[in-house]
Amino acid sequence: ETEMAVVTPLFKGHDELPDHASRFVDVDQLDWKPTPCEGIEMKILMEDEETGMMTAMFKWAPGSKLTFHEHVELEQTFVLEGSLVDDEGTITAGNYVWRPPGSQHDAWAPDGALILSMFLKPNIFLDGENKGVQLK
C-alpha cells in the first residue's frame, strides 16, 4: 500500500487504517495550535500534504484579527459561534461564506468566533511581520 498524503495531523490511530477506510476524528482530542495571528488558534481536521487542501476549525478570541491575506484558491467558511467581520460585511453563527481565488481581505471577530473553514490551498499573508507566510 502507498502512504496517503491526506492526514489529520497529531491524531493517533489513523496510520493503522486501510487506505480506503473512513477517518473518524474526535475533534476534542486535537489540541488547539497557535496561528501567526495573536488570539486565533486552529485545529487541522484534514490536510492534503501534497496539494495544500485543508479543513480546519479556528477559535478567535474577542477582538482578534486575521491580518491582510489572499485566498490563493477557493475558501469556504461556516460560522459555528460568534461572528466574523470584514470590509464586505458580517457573517454570523449558522451562516456560510465562500471566497473566490484571488480575494484579499483582513477579518476580525469583535466578540470572538468559532469557525469551520475549507481551503484548496492555504491563505498567504500579504503584509506585516507575517508577509509571505502560509496559514497552516
Residue map of PLM features:
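Short, charged/polar surface micro-motifs in flexible loops or helix N-caps
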Residues: 50-52, 61-64, 85, 103, ...
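Ligand-binding loop in jelly-roll beta-barrel domains
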Residues: 40, 101-126
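Conserved hydrophobic/aromatic beta-strand scaffold that supports enzyme active sites
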Residues: 42-44, 55-57, 76, 96-98, ...
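A short, N-terminal "cap"/entry segment at the start of jelly-roll beta-barrel domains
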Residues: 3-51, 132-136
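Short acidic-glycine-tyrosine-enriched beta hairpin
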Residues: 85-109
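Short histidine-centered beta-strand/loop micro-motifs
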Residues: 46, 56-58, 67-71, 88-89, ...
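Glycine- and acidic-residue-biased ligand/ion/polar-headgroup-sensing regions
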Residues: 61-64, 70-86
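Residue-level marker of beta-strand positions
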Residues: 65, 95-96, 114
